[in-house]
C-alpha cells in the first residue's frame, strides 16, 4: 500500500506564523512541495527524479498556495502564470520523500521561492509583481491528478472564508448572514438582496405547479429561433449563466435570444424583456461526453432593466456549503413528463433535496465529478426534465437570500426512482464565471465555429439528445482558482424578489392579509382577545399554559379563518372549547413547560383560510440565525394597551441559547427558545401569548418551532422574546391528543395560578405562507411517474366539474346496493393466502378499474359502483382534470390484456369540499360515456351503510401500484389483506392529519400496504352475507408498508349523501 504524507506547511522564517510539524523518518515521510524552474530548480529536480525513480514512489495531493495576491488575469486557465504554476506543482506532487533528512524551514522556503521565480523568469514573468508566497500546504491525499482537483489560492485554507483584508473566517457560510464576521465587514458589504418573498409553495416541474409573477425573477428563457430551448439564470445586468450542452448544436449567438421578467413563454406580461445574446463562453474544460464543466456564460447585447420582475440570483462564495438534505428550488419550462407530451406555458417550480455526493455517484456508476451536485429524491417523482437545462437550482439561506447552487445539467429519464437530477456545482466554477464577467476586454472562449445557416430543430426528438453520456470516464482538467468577488455582477442586488412583499415588524409592524397565517387563532373571553393559539389539527389548538391562569374555559371561544378581530373577511369561524390540558409540569413561577393543548367542541373544516401548521419531529433542529415568523393581535408597542384590529406579522431570528440566558441573567431551560434581534425593534408583545413562532423549513411548508411565552418588555434591546420549545414538548402533545379525555382534563378556574412577573406576550410576524402547510407525511397514492404529491399542487385550468353541494351523508339502515342487484359478489375463496400481497386472478375483483391517462398508461385505480359510475380519489385529477384525457379499463387483471373493456370518461366530479392540501374529502365520481357491459368479469361493488367498520375487520386492497416503495408498477392486479384500525390508533400514527372522513388500514409492523399507482382503488370488506362493500378509497400514506404508518383511505360512509345525490341525478 502506498503511504500517505502528513500535512506539510512551508513557511519562511521571517513570517513564521503557523506551527510546522516536522516529518518523521520512515515509511510515512513528509512530502516537500516545490515549484522548480529552469535555473536552480533543474538541479533540485534532477536529484529528486533520480532518487524517486529508484524508489518508485507515487502520491497525489491537493495543494493550496497562501499569500500570493492573485489578480483576475492569473485566473485564466490559458494564462502563462496559471499554466506554468499548475504544471510545476503537479510535477513535484508526484514525489514522496521517504529517506531524505527533513529540510529546514529556510531551505524549504528558498527552494519554493527560487524554483517558482526561475520558472516564471523564463517566460518574462516576475513573482514579485504578484506578492510573496507565505505558505504551501498539503491538505490530504486525493484520487486523480492535481489538475483535476482544486488548486486554490488566497490567504485561507480549504473551505475557510477569506475576507477582503485577508482575515480567515472558519464559520460556515458567513457571507450575507446578517452578522458581521470580518473585521472589515466585507462579508456583509454587498448583501442588500434576496429578501423573503410574500408567497411561495412547493411543487414539481415534472407534473408541477405554476410559479407566480416575480417569484423567480432570475429565471430566463433562452430562445433558439424563437422557440424555448433552455433555461438560464441572471447573475448580472448583462450576464447569464446556463449549461454548456445547450450550445452543442446551435453555437452562433445570433441564433439566440433571452426572455426575462415573465412566467409565460409567450411573454404576454408587460414586465417581459427580450434581448439578443451577444456572445457565448463555454467553459474551456467542458466535456460533451461526460458533461463535466457543463457551464456557459452569456453576454447580452444590452443590459437588463432590473425591477420587480427582473433580478439576479446571488452567486455563492467558493467556500459556500450547501449540505446534503437541504431543500432547494428548481424552475423551468421543461416538459412536464418524460415522453414530451406536455410542455407548460407557465413557469413551473419544484422543491428538491440535495443528495449526498457519494450516494449519488454510486447511483450513476461513479461517473460524477466534483463539478456536479445531485438533487431530487431517491423515489423519484420530482425532477427537472428536458427543456429545463441551464435553469437554476437555488437555495434559500437563513438570511432569506437565494443563492445559485447549481445549473440543470443532466440525468437519466425524468423523475425516475434512484435517478436524481445532476446539476453543475456553481461553487466549483464560480471563479471562472466571475473571470469571464469581469474581464471586459478578455476574448471570449470560442464556443465553436459558427454553424452554417441550416434549418434548426427547435426540439429534440429523444431524451438522449439532452442527456450527455453519463458513464464516460471524466477527463482531467485544472479547476479554476478562487477569485475575490467581482463587482460587475452587482451582487448587492442579487437574489431579490421585489415583486413579493417583504417582512417587517410586529411592534410597529404590518398587517397580514387573509389566508397568510391560516393556523393563527384568537382566544377570546367574551369580546376580549386575551391570547393567541395555533391550529395543529382539525380538533386541536396549541397555546401557552399561562393564558389559562385566571381563565374560565367554558367562557373561552376560538376565532379562526380571519385576520380581523372583528371577524371581517376571510372565512370566520367561532368555536367553543371542549377541554384544555396544561402540561403537568407547567411552572407558573418561571413559565417552564408553558404549553396548553386545547380541544375544540367540534372539528374544523380546513380551507384556504384555516390550515394547520406542521409539528416538528423531536429531533428537528432550528439553527441559530434561522428567520422565522411570529404573528398575533398583541400590543403594537410596549405600554400601549391598544391592540390592532388586523393580525400583525414579523420576521425574527433564532438566538443562541447560552447568549439568551446571559442576556436575561437566568439559566433558560431546555423547554425555552429565544428569537428576535439583539438590537430590539422586532418582538412579540402583550396579547400575543400562545401564538406561533413558525419556521419555513421547505419552501411553502411551515413548522411550529415555538409558542409565545414571555420576555422583558417588548422589542427592548438585548431582551429577545422567549418561546416554549415545541420539539421538547411534542411527545406530551401527541400523548395528550391520543389520551382518554379524563386523563387530560384539568380544572383551569383556580385562583391560585400566579400571573408571570413580566406580562405575557403575543406576537406578529411576517413571511407569507402558501396555503399548503400540513400533511407533509401525506403521500398521495396516485401516479408513479408524474404527480404523486398533489397536496402541494395547484392547477391552472381544471375541467373537472363540482356537483352536489350537499355534503351530509344519507342514513340508510344497511348496505346501500348499487343499481345492479348483484353488487359485491366475488368468487369464493377470494381472501385465501393474500397477506403480503399476491397476484389476482381473472374475475376475482370484478369492480376494479384501471384509469388510463391518454389511453397510454395506468395512472390511478377506480371502483365500479353503478352501471356508468366509478368512484376514485380526487387527487388523481389535480393535474389532469379534463375527462377527455382519461379512459377506464375494466374486466381484466392484466394491464396488457386485449380482452378488457375500455370506456370513455364523460365527466369528473370531485367532492366540493375536497382539500388539496390535507386530502380531506379525497373522493371523485367519474361518469362513463355509456353503461358498462355487465358480466362475471365486470360487476359493481356495494356501497356501505353509515356505520364505521368494526375495528380489526379484515378487508382487502387491490391495485396495480408499485410493488414496493420506489419500485415499478405491477402489470397484473395485486391483492392484499389488511386490518381496519381504530380511529384512536389511526390518530396516534398520524396525530395531525386525520379527519373524520379518513380511516386507516394496515398493520402496525408494516409490510402490507397500498402504494403509488393504487390511488382511487378499493378497500373492500366482506359482510356476513358474502357481499363485498366499499369501505374506503385509497388516498395517501407515509411511504409504502412502513412500520407505524398505515395506509389512509377516504371513508366512503362519510360521503354517501354526495355519492347518492350525483348518481341519482
UniProtKB/Swiss-Prot annotation:
**Where does the record place the region Disordered?**
445-500, 740-762, 788-814
Cystine residue pairs? 156-168, 163-182, 176-191, 230-246, 328-395, 360-374, 385-414, 531-547, 628-695, 660-674, 685-714, 860-876, 955-1021, 986-1000, 1011-1040
Q: Residue limits of the LDL-receptor class A domain?
A: 155-192
The UniProt entry, under InterPro entries, shows: LDL_receptor-like_sf (IPR036055), LDrepeatLR_classA_rpt (IPR002172), Peptidase_S1_PA (IPR009003), Peptidase_S1_PA_chymotrypsin (IPR043504), Peptidase_S1A (IPR001314), Tmprss9 (IPR017324), Trypsin_dom (IPR001254), TRYPSIN_HIS (IPR018114)
Q: What does this protein do?
A: Serase-1 and serase-2 are serine proteases that hydrolyze the peptides N-t-Boc-Gln-Ala-Arg-AMC and N-t-Boc-Gln-Gly-Arg-AMC. In contrast, N-t-Boc-Ala-Phe-Lys-AMC and N-t-Boc-Ala-Pro-Ala-AMC are not significantly hydrolyzed.
Task: Please give the name of this protein.
Answer: Transmembrane protease serine 9
User: Might you give the EC number(s) for this enzyme?
Assistant: 3.4.21.-
Record-marked site positions (Cleavage): 204-205, 505-506, 833-834
Chain ranges on the Extracellular side, renumbered to this chain: 53-1065
Taxonomy of origin reads: Eukaryota, Metazoa, Chordata, Craniata, Vertebrata
For bias type Pro residues, the affected ranges are 452-461
Signal peptide, first to last residue = none
